[in-house]
Amino acid sequence: MCAQDAFQTQRSQLVELLVSGSLEGFESILDRLLSREVLSWEDYEGLSLVGQPISHLARRLLDTIWNKGTWGCEQLTAAVREAQADSQPPELPSSWDPHSPHPARDLQSHRPAIVRRLYGHVEGVLDLTQQRGFISQYETDEIRRPIFTSSQRARRLLDLATVKANGLAAFLLQCIQELPVPLALPFEDAACKKYVSKLRTVISAQSRFLSTYDGAENLCLEEVYTENVLEIQMEVGMAGPSQQSPTTLGLEELFSTRDHFNKEADTVLVVGEAGSGKSTLLQQLHLLWASGRAFQEFLFVFPFSCRQLQCLVKPLSMRTLLFEHCCWPDLGPQDVFQVLLDHPERILLTFDGFDEFRFRFTDQERHCCPTAPTSVQSLLFNLLQGNLLKNARKVLTSRPSAVSASLRKHVRTELSLKGFSEEGIELYLRKRHREPGVADRLLCLLRATSALHGLCHLPVFSWMVSKCHEELLLQGRGSPKTTTDMYLLILRHFLLHASPLPLATHGLGPSLIQGRLPTLLHLGRLALWGLGTCCYVFSAKQLQAAHVDSEDLSLGFLVLAKRVVPGSTAPLEFLHITFQCFFAAFYLALSADTPPSSLRHLFQDHRPESSPLARVLPKLFLRGSRCREGSVAALLQGAEPHNLQITGAFLAGLLSQEHRSLLAECQASETALLRRWDCVRRCLTRSLREHFRSIPPALPGEAKSMHALPGFLWLIRSLYEMQEERLAREAVCRLNVGHLKLTFCGVGPAECAALAFVLRHLRRPVALQLDHNSVGDIGVEQLLPCLGVCKALYLRDNNISDRGICKLVEHALRCEQLQKLALFNNKLTDGCAHSMARLLACKQNFLALRLGNNHITAAGAEVLAQGLRTNNSLQFLGFWGNQVGDEGAQALAAALGDHQSLRWLSLVGNNIGSVGAQALALMLEKNMALEELCLEENHVQDEGVCFLAKGLARNSSLKVLKLSNNHISSLGAEALLRALEKNDTILEVWLRGNTFSPEEIEKLSHQDTRLLL
């Protein structure tokens, strides 16, 4: 009773201790009490209710323990003391039996140690338990609710194991045995703890506000952050016809993927075009870590900006890099550094903007000493290779064009940041505009102007639309179509806000620009100098040299650089790299110092630095070009190709007829503008013709094919920015190809608009292949103007839904030339079936429809079959990787029985059994045109094969029958052999991956060589 009396007198202090920490700490106390059988399972359930205030739960716990007597009170006191001391739970005993006859009891008695071991692995274990059928999707989603930490998710999984009687507890015992033993935290000394705390504080302060795109206001990142589409990048050439679309990840799954280019590497590469949200993604990662909400497997996070790193000219060591250029330890720096060296697996380093690092990656110079000074590029390259801090995880962001093959050798996983989905655009605008009706009006505007909607898939454009929403909604101006239109709109917005009120009524007229022309030219000269010298952050001295003063800075286009070491002077940078390119283009368009002849460097595809020798000897090539140092030509020659492409597109837009008249009133000589326009026009036309001349001749019997590269796409975008039909017509008048291939080229909606603007002037029909891009529904809409010159359109793996395809089909019905559509690996469902059926019924010259790897079921197949009944032209129908089942197979077979033109039918992986096989067999008896039937990866089995054998015996057209992976035994094979005796037409029957023994395979192979086993 004495212990109980003491317990009662300390009740208020115990309540305070229990509620002073987090819910995580409270639950760890429950773990200890449950494992020691102080609490029964019923007690625990009443104390672990989600959503209850922790103070309420604490008082209920004290009441429960009081009723258990002295021993219970002593155990609770001990558990609270252990939690206060942050002592680690004991590890699982060496006598641990993963095959225990009482698995649920063992999970409970060792619960604290099991929670600790599951920490860091709970997501993988959850996936495994769901795959094995132990828990449902609903239960998985409940456990993965965002409010739960990893430890809390582990506890919820253990709770399920206690109440489920389906073998989950036994399965978890075995899983836990295989998990690695967690490292005991070696970071108990005060210096290390204080450093971790300081790191979190510094990174939280740097990450909390999103000011990269706006110098006028600070946006709270948590309030506006919107997930981008993040996909695992496939290797070019590795995607087979049946491969599924790339996996889409959430940010918190950044390190969870098992798709590795190089399992020995430590670097995760995130690629994305300028404005796709790479920097913001890293900023959100940093904030999640600093606030303790994610990525807690890392105890140390070190963020770096490549554009700032390249400014470091003095040799430095890794220790200097981490401490002096990120965060300095206030206590025991040597002890802290030793901990970092001893435990690199607890470290995450992020490097943002590798495309802005002027040094080209090389793995020739090896540097392994963490305390020896070396150049900043050597330090970075050896960190990425793992020569320094091996096993520390690194995240590197870059534009795709800056990533070389030699760098990719050291990449563990490559992820592609695609920008916003349509849902993401809406979510972002609603977060930015919470006033009633504003977001709705903006979204209506976007949906009514597909060109602007297409631009908004890049977050930088969504920000611009949000920033300029008043101009877009209230002033009645024509909606922007091109990138240049959008940047001129944001320029107008900033100028109006910096101008006296009377000027605000004049719009973006000559007076508004002319009044700030000196400022714009100062910024333009600084931007161009920065591009030419690969400088993207500017010191006060550099600003002074460019004559940029405080009045120029007041416009807001230059903002303080992020990730600056505390206590140092922050340099300035443009809002975004695209703004730097825009101002450089503005300077090139209006400055009297710009010779028109120098503009050719913007549009040359074969620049000297593109050759291997030029990369080795860049200074030699620059001298050989005889450009005066600091001249426009010299700066353009020194700029990175991807920045030249953006600048060239902006210049083309500024010199377009629409915008040239605006700029002419700010320029003393209109003749100078016309000269520059003429130079850009000639350069674009010449560069395109060089592309066309480089096309190899067609192979005998094949159409002439052009595999375009991203550089070609930028030339097309520049033509689109100029918005001149005559120039587009002249540019492609000599393009004589039958097949234009633009796969893996980063084609999004904006690029689709540019392609359609130019390609619609082709004189001959072309097969346009846009596989493995980011076209989406909006991009499909942008392509419609050029559909009339397409004889085939390939849109594999482009995130297209029913809405986009229905619009495409509606337009295709009026396009006589279009004969082939390839739409596999998208998001199509039964909702598009009526449109597809109408296409087949109405276009009697249509030859090929490929719909593989979508989400079409029997209902969709039945609708499509209606169109097939009246079609007399289709030769290829691809349905692999859907879910048509037996009913869908029956509907298709009934429609194809009398079809006179179909030669190839694929129903691979459609869950077709013997019933569907019987229907297809009846179709084979009637159809005398089909030459290849693909039924791999179904459930045909012997019964279905016997039906097919009967149909085969009466068929005289089929040449190839594919039945691999269908659970067929020798019984089914014997039926096929009997049918083959009566059929001389069939050339191949595929039976690989079925249930034959080695002896049966050898025997069957000798009986008929047409059986491929």
Swiss-Prot record:
Residues 1-95, 99-191 form the CARD domain. It is a lipid-anchor. Residues 266-591 form the NACHT domain. A lipid is attached at C368 (S-palmitoyl cysteine). It holds the Pfam family CARD. ADP binds at T212, Y225, T226, G275, S276, G277, K278, S279, T280, H576. Its main location: membrane. InterPro entries: CARD, DEATH-like_dom_sf, Leu-rich_rpt, LRR_dom_sf, NACHT_NTPase, NLR, NLRP_HD2, NOD1/2_WH. It is found in: Cell membrane; Basolateral cell membrane; Cytoplasm; Mitochondrion. Palmitoylated by ZDHHC5; palmitoylation is required for proper recruitment to the bacterial entry site and hence for proper signaling upon cognate peptidoglycan detection. Palmitoylation promotes localization to the cell membrane. Palmitoylation protects from SQSTM1/p62-dependent autophagic degradation. Polyubiquitinated by TRIM27, leading to proteasome-mediated degradation. Polyubiquitinated and degraded following muramyl dipeptide (MDP) stimulation, conferring MDP tolerance and preventing septic shock. One of its GO terms (molecular function) is actin binding. Homooligomer: homooligomerizes following muramyl dipeptide (MDP)-binding, promoting RIPK2 recruitment. Interacts (via CARD domain) with RIPK2 (via CARD domain). Following RIPK2 recruitment, RIPK2 homooligomerizes via its CARD domain and forms long filaments named RIPosomes. Interacts (via CARD domain) with ubiquitin; inhibiting interaction with RIPK2. Component of a signaling complex consisting of ARHGEF2, NOD2 and RIPK2. Interacts with ANKRD17 (via N-terminus). Interacts with HSPA1A; the interaction enhances NOD2 stability. This is Nucleotide-binding oligomerization domain-containing protein 2. It comes from Bos taurus (Bovine). The gene is NOD2.
